[in-house]
Each structure stands twice: as C-alpha cells, then as structure tokens.
C-alpha cells in the first residue's frame, strides 16, 4: 500500500484536501476521484492526486471526472 494525497483545486488554490489515503495502486484512485467529483459544485475545479513524494500522478477536471463516473456516458 502506498499513500496518496487527493486535492481539489480552484485555479491554483487548494480548496479541499484528503491527505495520506492508502491505496494498493493508482487504478484504485479512480473510484475515490469519482466520489469527490460528485460533491464538487464550483465550475472550473480540478482534482489532483499526488504521491507522497509530491509528484502529481493524476490531474483531471471535475466535470470530466463526473462524466467518467457516470456509466451511462459512452466513451
């Protein structure tokens, strides 16, 4: 298990964060991203996932993450 930090960004400002989330691998981050995205109502927000080293491994717009989380939206 590795620890990952989840952050919601509005511009360059972090408006919400959930640090040190244990995940078995980076693919396990997507359900968490979808859950966070469903709660975001501000336009233009992004969700960033960082490794404990500080390296960004996922950066996605909240709207895109919401669409990804909706199984009725075809790719």
Write out the residue ranges for each language-model feature:
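Short aromatic-glycine-(Arg/Gly/Cys) micro-motifs in beta-strand/loop hairpins
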Residues: 1-17
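Generic recognition of well-ordered secondary-structure surfaces with a strong bias
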Residues: 6, 29, 47-49
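Short, contiguous acidic and Ser/Thr-rich linear segments
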Residues: 17-26
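A short, charged, amphipathic alpha-helix used as a generic interaction element across diverse proteins
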Residues: 25-41
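Short, mixed-charge low-complexity intrinsically disordered segments
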Residues: 39-75
